[in-house]
Amino acid sequence: MFVTSAFAEETAPAVTGGDTHSGTGVPAEAHGTFPPFDPATFPSQLLWLAITFGLFYLFLKKVAMPRIGGIIDVRNDRISQDLDQASKLKGEADAAVAAYEQELAEAKKNASSIGQQAADAAKAEAETARKKIEAALDEKLGEAEARISSIKANAMKEVGSIAEDTASAIVEALVGGKASKAEIAAAVKSVAR
């Protein structure tokens, strides 16, 4: 702390009684021990110690411990209720999971059955359509074969007349004379067989 000269004293205060203090020491009247360690006060200290601990014990026994015991009992009851409820909820959850898994298995089974039925229906439908198409194709094939045989028969009739005309033209060109139609027809028939 900064002290200005206005606050500072020029001279020390005078000592009353003419004594000056020149040493440090214990005053003559202050001899003895610290009171709690004085053996003369031990009996009263022990009495108050016993009274204090007795009152403290009664306070703990009558007030603090019943409250603490009640709190512990309430907490134990709450914990047991929570455990019971958790066990109940776990059972319900397990039952729900089992029901879900059973429904899932049934759904898979039903889906498999439905898929098989759809595949069988599609196969039967395809078989029916194939049979219809085969019948239509067989009918068209029969018609085509009939037309082909008709065309072939007509062509064979015409081939005979074409062969007769061609043979007649060849005989005329080679021999220079005409052959009769009966002779040419007989020659064509003999070659065709």
Curated annotation (Swiss-Prot):
Primary subcellular site in the record, as a coarse category: membrane
Disordered: annotated span: 13-32
Transmembrane annotation, as ranges: 40-60
Localization: Cell inner membrane
Pfam families linked: ATP-synt_B (PF00430)
UniProt topology in membrane: Single-pass membrane protein
Family annotation (CDD domains): ATP-synt_Fo_b
InterPro entries: ATP_synth_b/b'su_bac/chlpt, ATP_synthase_B_chain
Domain of life assignment: Bacteria
Protein keywords: ATP synthesis, Cell inner membrane, Cell membrane, CF(0), Hydrogen ion transport, Ion transport, Membrane, Transmembrane, Transmembrane helix, Transport
Record-level Gene Ontology MF annotations: proton-transporting ATP synthase activity, rotational mechanism; proton-transporting ATPase activity, rotational mechanism
Gene Ontology, cellular component aspect: plasma membrane; proton-transporting ATP synthase complex
Family designation: Belongs to the ATPase B chain family.
Matches recorded under HAMAP family: ATP_synth_b_bprime (MF_01398)
Description of how the protein assembles with itself and partners: F-type ATPases have 2 components, F(1) - the catalytic core - and F(0) - the membrane proton channel. F(1) has five subunits: alpha(3), beta(3), gamma(1), delta(1), epsilon(1). F(0) has three main subunits: a(1), b(2) and c(10-14). The alpha and beta chains form an alternating ring which encloses part of the gamma chain. F(1) is attached to F(0) by a central stalk formed by the gamma and epsilon chains, while a peripheral stalk is formed by the delta and b chains.
Role of this protein: F(1)F(0) ATP synthase produces ATP from ADP in the presence of a proton or sodium gradient. F-type ATPases consist of two structural domains, F(1) containing the extramembraneous catalytic core and F(0) containing the membrane proton channel, linked together by a central stalk and a peripheral stalk. During catalysis, ATP synthesis in the catalytic domain of F(1) is coupled via a rotary mechanism of the central stalk subunits to proton translocation. Component of the F(0) channel, it forms part of the peripheral stalk, linking F(1) to F(0).
Stated name of the protein: ATP synthase subunit b 1
Gene symbol of the encoding locus: atpF1
